[in-house]
UniProtKB/Swiss-Prot annotation:
Species of origin: Hydrogenovibrio crunogenus (strain DSM 25203 / XCL-2)
Subcellular location: Cytoplasm
Full protein name: 7-methyl-GTP pyrophosphatase
InterPro entries assigned: ITPase-like_fam, Maf-like
Superkingdom, natural source: Bacteria
Swiss-Prot/TrEMBL catalytic activity: N(7)-methyl-GTP + H2O = N(7)-methyl-GMP + diphosphate + H(+)
Family named by the database record: Belongs to the Maf family. YceF subfamily.
Annotated site location: Important for substrate specificity: 18, 76, 160
Cofactor(s) the protein requires to work: a divalent metal cation
UniProt GO cellular component terms: cytoplasm
GO biological process, one term: nucleotide metabolic process
Entry keyword annotation includes GTP-binding: no
């Protein structure tokens, strides 16, 4: 393909500015749409199962309105010692989270679904990224929270911003997955949908 006229409509099923910015790296024309699904976890559902289910549900919700489009959807959840990590919402809760994570490792599970509504084919994967925090002082934590205010972010940090200063190590296949969209796997899936990348 060498013309946008030949490209199918590509829709990112997300309102996240971070996912939008990541997808823009691929230099493909796309639009965004809010999947507007219920993201409540099921009773006794594992984090991995939830992430996979929600990624698929987001894709299908948007696909219903766009019969010939390619839908990209993602969901992410972090775990610490096997338990889901929530959003702190307040400064005291964020301090508590970061104190708990000091010197420890948390896992980010990022689900990705590409649904080709032309063929009804689904491409799905789960990326796991391990983030190890350095030993954090009270000053480290206070200064970071005042500067970045990550109170709506699971784990009380923004890895795409100043949060990177809190880490000693990141282990994973794709650094973009930690921010919310695994671009390496996404590129592979789009190629299977006959989208040439790099696209000119």
């Amino acid at each position: 393909m060498n013309s946008t006229a030949k490209l199918p409509k590509i829709i990112l099923a997300s309102t996240s500015p971070f996912r939008k910015a990541l997808l823009q790296k691929l230099r493909l024309p796309f639009i965004t749409e809010n999947p507007a699904i219920d993201e409540t976890p099921y009773p006794h559902e594992s984090v991995v199962d939830m992430v996979n289910r929600l990624s698929l549900a987001k894709a299908h919700a948007v696909a219903e309105k766009h019969p010939n489009a390619i839908i990209i959807a993602s969901d992410q959840s972090a775990t610490y010692q096997g338990q889901a990590v929530g959003k702190p919402h307040t400064y005291p809760n964020a301090v508590q989270q970061l104190n708990q994570f000091s010197g420890e490792t948390i896992h980010f599970n990022t689900g990705l679904v590409v649904f080709d509504n032309r063929t009804q084919k689904t491409y799905q994967t789960l990326d796991v990224t391990k983030v190890t925090f350095r030993t954090l002082s009270e000053t480290d934590i206070h200064n970071y929270l005042i500067l970045e205010e990550p109170y709506q972010c699971a784990g009380s940090f923004k890895s795409e911003g100043l949060g990177i200063t809190l880490f000693s190590k990141i282990e994973g296949k794709d650094p973009n997955a930690l921010i919310g969209l695994p671009l390496i796997d996404l590129t592979s899936f789009l190629k299977q949908c006959d989208i040439q990348l790099p696209f000119l």
